[in-house]
């Protein structure tokens, strides 16, 4: 029976590095404090003339090629981002479609913050398994630096820029086993992008977070969510080949890893070099594992993510891409 499969993974990493040492010169913080509290050592920052759609396009082109397809084979583009090119329209997905030379295809954005890539997998799975679409391009892309207040030391130390992409198509062997997504809007004010009204035509956006509250809820929610999706599918944690979580904070990742009793060899961690890239973090981490030879065709992968909204989700899949 044919089912939805993640047939490729790719990423685009901006060249500019913003290290903790650099941040010491910008706000009242230290490299030691940031690393101890978050696990982050550096993050990437896009050029001023690079938009979120540009980052996403570069990752998308690699993902399409790795799926042995051409851009014209894509019949839907889904983008998860909290830092779109434009405040309301056009969507970043439409901009990427234009960059790829594609018209008359479905293209839309999903707003699920750091959980965005899990939501993309769920939607792409539904589209291809229903027969509505054949090859769905999913992209997590973020230029968080465009909405970052670099005078706010509580949050500017956390985030970076980047993009990751993959293609979802049908396969009869290595497919997406299950995806679970959920939300609780009662906690929306703990993590948000705040709009301040300067005039009727001029607005500024900045990200705000109540970190301690978010941390506690994230650890409890993710720990329960991954246990539930494994139990639902009668899979033991030890059967997982790779655990690839959203890269928000090393302490959150380690808490869930400990809950599952997984070895370091089975846990993919990239937060130290990219920071939190929101919806892009899971596909970026997957691509690192793929290019390092850790992620191989047929591997059983567990993904999880938690983000503003609150939103969260997890996914179980057997990777369908060819080995790097």
From Swiss-Prot:
Tell me what organism the protein belongs to.
Campylobacter jejuni subsp. doylei (strain ATCC BAA-1458 / RM4099 / 269.97)
Recorded family membership:
Belongs to the thiolase-like superfamily. FabH family.
Under what name is this protein listed?
Beta-ketoacyl-[acyl-carrier-protein] synthase III
Q: In which pathway does it act?
A: Lipid metabolism; fatty acid biosynthesis
Q: Which cysteines are joined by disulfide bonds?
A: none
* GO BP: any one term: secondary metabolite biosynthetic process
Q: What does this protein do?
A: Catalyzes the condensation reaction of fatty acid synthesis by the addition to an acyl acceptor of two carbons from malonyl-ACP. Catalyzes the first condensation reaction which initiates fatty acid synthesis and may therefore play a role in governing the total rate of fatty acid production. Possesses both acetoacetyl-ACP synthase and acetyl transacylase activities. Its substrate specificity determines the biosynthesis of branched-chain and/or straight-chain of fatty acids.
Q: Which GO terms describe its molecular function?
A: 3-oxoacyl-[acyl-carrier-protein] synthase activity; beta-ketoacyl-acyl-carrier-protein synthase III activity
Region annotated ACP-binding sits at 247-251
Q: Which Pfam families match?
A: ACP_syn_III, ACP_syn_III_C
Summarize subunit and interaction data from the UniProt record for this chain.
Homodimer.
User: Which compartment or compartments is the protein found in?
Assistant: Cytoplasm
Keyword Cytoplasm on entry = yes
Its top-level enzyme class, in one word, is transferase
- PANTHER family found in the cross-reference section: 3-OXOACYL-[ACYL-CARRIER-PROTEIN] SYNTHASE 3 (PTHR34069), BETA-KETOACYL-[ACYL-CARRIER-PROTEIN] SYNTHASE III (PTHR34069:SF2)
Q: Which UniProt keywords apply?
A: Acyltransferase, Cytoplasm, Fatty acid biosynthesis, Fatty acid metabolism, Lipid biosynthesis, Lipid metabolism, Multifunctional enzyme, Transferase
Catalyses: malonyl-[ACP] + acetyl-CoA + H(+) = 3-oxobutanoyl-[ACP] + CO2 + CoA
Name the domain of life: Bacteria
């Amino acid at each position: 029976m044919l089912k939805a499969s993640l047939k490729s993974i790719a990423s685009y990493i901006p060249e500019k590095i913003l290290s903790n040492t650099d941040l010491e010169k910008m706000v009242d913080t230290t490299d030691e404090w940031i690393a101890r509290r978050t696990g982050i050592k550096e993050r990437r920052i896009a050029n001023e003339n690079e938009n979120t759609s540009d980052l996403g396009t570069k990752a998308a082109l690699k993902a399409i090629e790795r799926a042995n397809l051409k851009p014209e084979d894509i019949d839907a583009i889904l983008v998860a981002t909290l830092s779109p090119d434009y405040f309301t329209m056009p969507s970043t997905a439409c901009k990427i479609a234009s960059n790829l030379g594609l018209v008359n295809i479905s293209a839309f954005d999903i707003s699920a913050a750091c959980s965005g890539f899990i939501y993309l997998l769920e939607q792409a799975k539904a589209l291809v398994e229903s027969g509505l679409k054949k090859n769905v391009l999913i992209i997590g892309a973020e230029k968080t630096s465009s909405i970052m207040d670099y005078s706010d030391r509580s949050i500017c130390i956390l985030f970076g820029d980047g993009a990751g992409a993959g293609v979802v198509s049908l396969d009869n062997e290595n497919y997406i086993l299950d995806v679970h997504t959920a939300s609780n809007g009662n906690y929306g004010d703990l993590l948000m992008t705040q709009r301040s009204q300067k005039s009727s035509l001029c607005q500024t956006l900045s990200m705000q977070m109540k970190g301690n509250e978010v941390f506690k809820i994230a650890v409890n929610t993710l720990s329960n969510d991954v246990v539930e999706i494994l139990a639902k599918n009668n899979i033991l944690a030890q059967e997982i080949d790779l655990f690839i979580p959203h890269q928000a904070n090393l302490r959150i990742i380690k808490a869930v890893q400990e809950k599952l009793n997984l070895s370091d060899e089975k846990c993919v961690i990239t937060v130290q070099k990219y920071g939190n890239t929101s919806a892009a973090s899971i596909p970026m981490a997957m691509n690192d594992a793929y290019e390092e030879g850790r992620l191989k065709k047929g591997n059983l992968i567990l993904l999880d993510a938690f983000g503003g909204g609150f939103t969260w989700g997890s996914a179980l899949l057997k990777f369908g891409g060819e080995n790097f």
